A protein has these predicted regions:
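Charge-rich, well-structured scaffold segments of protease-associated domains
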Residues: 1-39, 76, 107-244
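His/Glu-based metal-binding/catalytic segments typifying zinc-dependent metallopeptidases
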Residues: 39-97
Length: 244
């Protein structure tokens, strides 16, 4: 696309044991001849708040197993609340000891798969919880079981043990992601592109996550993860449409 794939909308990160003057010369040789594109105007469309549950069905001829998607509108990635939602995602579904996985997949054998994640975007983001049923489990049953776990987060502080586990997980992931030159280069590029050019986040991001408290987790869940603020999508095989 000539509008977006242009030098003035690209980020080049060079990391490593480099000769800086020589590197700048090579960059100029390879990239300077590429013409600048038009200035890109960016706008932020304000959406009306979701105040009632939106229910929808979608049919796909290429799937055999249905799925439930619960989607909530959440704030842009460069906010504290977005980071808190990342923590909630890890608590709910990251790893076999996470609350939803342990409950629905391991213990109750209701689900083939469950996931919770915040799709971070620049303006609004989308928090998604999805699950695939196992056996005779209905999508409505999965919704009820998922909502039960979300309500616990909204009404109770998570345990100190779980909180410390989350802290350790985020520290481990951050260190691992930046353990080599390629990881550092990728982080710097992402911070510049998605966080208003703030590459200092490579030194601050971990502390931002570690500053999130148990009360923050409860308050953010109360603010965004409400049943009247979401889309409830039943994603179904085409054959189920024909049966109706």
């Amino acid at each position: 696309n000539k509008k977006y794939y242009v030098p003035n909308n690209a980020i080049l990160t060079v990391a490593g044991d480099i000769d800086i003057p020589q590197t700048k010369e090579w960059i100029s040789d390879y990239f300077a001849p590429i013409p600048r594109g038009v200035t890109i105007e960016r706008s932020f469309t304000k959406e009306r708040p979701i105040t009632e549950t939106i229910r929808a069905e979608a049919y796909d001829p290429n799937i055999q197993i249905p799925a439930i998607f619960l989607a909530y509108r959440t704030p842009g990635r460069n906010t504290r609340d977005a980071r808190v939602l990342d923590v909630i995602s890890t608590y709910l579904s990251k790893g076999k000891s996470s609350k939803l996985y342990k409950k629905l997949v391991d213990n109750q054998k209701m689900s083939l798969q469950v996931a919770a994640f915040n799709m971070n975007n620049e303006d609004y983001s989308t928090y998604v919880i999805l699950s695939l049923p196992l056996g005779e489990t209905t999508l409505s049953t999965l919704v009820a079981e998922i909502d039960e776990e979300v309500e616990k987060i909204k009404n109770e502080l998570i345990s100190e043990k779980d909180y410390q586990k989350l802290q350790n997980q985020f520290e481990s992931e951050f260190v691992s992601a930046n353990a080599n030159i390629a990881g550092i280069a990728n982080s710097l590029a992402e911070y510049y592109a998605f966080y208003d050019g703030n590459t200092d986040l490579i030194n601050e991001e971990l502390d931002l996550y570690k500053s999130i408290s148990r009360e923050d987790i409860r308050q953010v869940a109360r603010k965004y993860l409400n049943t009247n603020q979401r889309l409830e999508l039943h994603y179904l095989p085409e054959s189920q449409k024909e049966e109706k």
